[in-house]
Amino acid sequence: MLVLFTDTDCDVSPKLAEELGYKLISMPYEIQGKSTRPFVDFEEFDPHPFYEQLRKGVLPNTYALNPYTYREYFEPIFKNGDDILYVHFSSAMSGTFNAMNIALDELKEEYPERKFYEIDTRGITLLSLNIVYEVSKLYKEGKSVEEILNWAEQEVDHFTVYFFAEDLNFFKHSGRVSGLAAFFGTLIGIRPIMFMDSDGKMKTCGKEHGRRNACRHLVNVMKEIGDNVQDYHIIIGHTDFQEGVDALVEILKQEFGKDVKYEVIDINPTIGSHCGPNAMGLCFHSTKR
């Protein structure tokens, strides 16, 4: 039997994981000296109190899981005689996968007949979630692991996310932009437009002055490179930024019709630790990243 895994950095909750047929790995963060594992140390994520702390100047950190924790997740599956397919966030964004590989090397010696497969979504949060949705669909249709992996090889780069943040200081803290760029960008209202490239790394592709122009930029990109977007999930993810969501949805309906279907999610606190409050992204099926 094949057992599906994903993680909270793909913005999957325990409830959604159960609906889609996944076991869920919790990716931790630390805030004010307290280590927290989403949906292990709390049942539901309440975004507003978390992001209010960040607005008041609290700077959280994230850290990698250790090999022992990965063993705790994977060994019971192997011991039961099952194989694993893990759909995860970008391996280029974290050292946690080094720890995972250490654990897997040990487990392969102990359970040599068992198989471990992985799909690197080369994304985070809503981009990864979109791929999690599609893999679940294929699995429930009875596709073999080889068919699912072949699909991923062809399709992962056909899901893309474009996003921006109103406060660049959190990207500065995580090393994504320089201190000077963060200071002046936030001061004069410049919103760099960013995306996840085919290597799973965050890149800047432009900049806009003001919230509404940034929202329009995201929708314009979807018009330009979107591919059968309404046959797949259109996902808007945000960090306690309802005003931005409202502006984006208004423009989305202007360009794609008032009946356009979309999903809005709260970005998880581990990823939110890096982008801060008032960040937002748009994910869709595309011709390219």
Predicted regions and their residues:
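Glycine-rich phosphate- or other oxyanion-binding loops that anchor nucleotides, phosphorylated ligands
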Residues: 55-93, 98-102, 149
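Local beta-strand N-terminus motif with an aromatic residue
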Residues: 1-2, 81
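N-terminal glycine-rich anion-binding loop in soluble enzyme alpha/beta folds
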Residues: 3-63, 69
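A short glycine/small-residue-enriched secondary-structure motif
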Residues: 44-51, 74, 78-79, 106
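Acidic/glycine-enriched edge-of-secondary-structure segments
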Residues: 51-67, 198-213
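Mixed-charge interfacial surface used for oligomerization/domain docking
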Residues: 3, 9-23, 28-30, 92-96, ...
